[in-house]
């Protein structure tokens, strides 16, 4: 999980979702998991 000030999709499998006001990226590649913080 990377915590970054700006999150971007890395590949086309990445999905941008919002959970409790936090922007997250989920992907089938675990290295692409990110959250905005």
UniProtKB/Swiss-Prot annotation:
InterPro entries per UniProt: Ribosomal_bL36 (IPR000473), Ribosomal_bL36_sp (IPR035977)
Pfam families, A to Z: Ribosomal_L36
Q: Which GO terms describe its biological process?
A: translation
Protein name, entry field: Large ribosomal subunit protein bL36
Instruction: Give GO cellular component annotations, separated by semicolons.
Output: cytoplasm; ribonucleoprotein complex; ribosome
Q: Which domain of life is it from?
A: Bacteria
Similarity comment text for this entry: Belongs to the bacterial ribosomal protein bL36 family.
Alphabetic keyword roster? Ribonucleoprotein, Ribosomal protein
Record-linked NCBIfam families: rpmJ_bact
- Annotated organism of origin: Dechloromonas aromatica (strain RCB)
- Statement: the UniProt record of this protein carries the keyword Ribosomal protein: yes
Q: Name one GO molecular function term.
A: structural constituent of ribosome
